[in-house]
Amino acid sequence: MLGTVIATPTLNERAMYTAFSAARNSACLSRQVGAAITSADGEILATGWNDVPKAFGGLYQTETYGSSPDEDRRCWNLGGGFCSNDQEKRAISNAIVDLLTSEGLIEEAKRDQVYQVIRKKSQLKSLIEFSRAVHAEMHALLSAGGTDGGKIRGGKLFVTTYPCHSCARHIVAAGVREVYFLEPYRKSLATKLHEDAITENENETDKVRVMPFDGVAPSRFLRFFSAHPKGRKNAEGNMHTREAHPVAFVTIEAIPTLESLIVQGLSSRGI
């Protein structure tokens, strides 16, 4: 990417950028996730993001600036803003401690200590099913199913975060063939629960492949694919010829090397 030729995004890069952009619609307190579904030919069928569903279809979203906040019933606008998933996990942790105390298995003086162990160190912390939000992948599947359902089968799903195990089974059932993600998600048990249908091995084509995205990152999309500020053609209509010049400056030095260079520079200045 030296700016000497016109480069446009691949189908996969375009789809992932679309998913990345869709994530910005989310008001979820935990994380913003975006998804995009394409047909086998790369046609974008639908996008989705994680947020709270509203009655009779769709998700809550900002319709227009200045609209009444009372109409927005997302978590950020309820009771000062709270995550229902965290709230329920706290309630479960307290209920377990109450039970252990009432059964005489722990002393009253150790309630707080036991609560912290249960809440922070047990598998309870990984529970995700108490969230009010529809996940981005499900939102995209629902949207695509309503208009282009037949094209989902054999298609691809692009998502900014690795699918959770709940979404994974719906992705498999929908007939999606490949999934590409940007960020890992340690809580997901997708391959553990569905090893018969899901794989992270790109060579296993008899299963739904879940693979890290390879291409221009969405955060760099506009930088790499926007036209040159001075335009692409001259007054005669001929394309400009330009000297090779990096579109983005990224050092290839390792971090320890960079740190040592900085230390040397500071030392030479007596700092």
Describe the residue ranges of each PLM region:
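Zinc-dependent deaminase catalytic domain
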Residues: 1-271
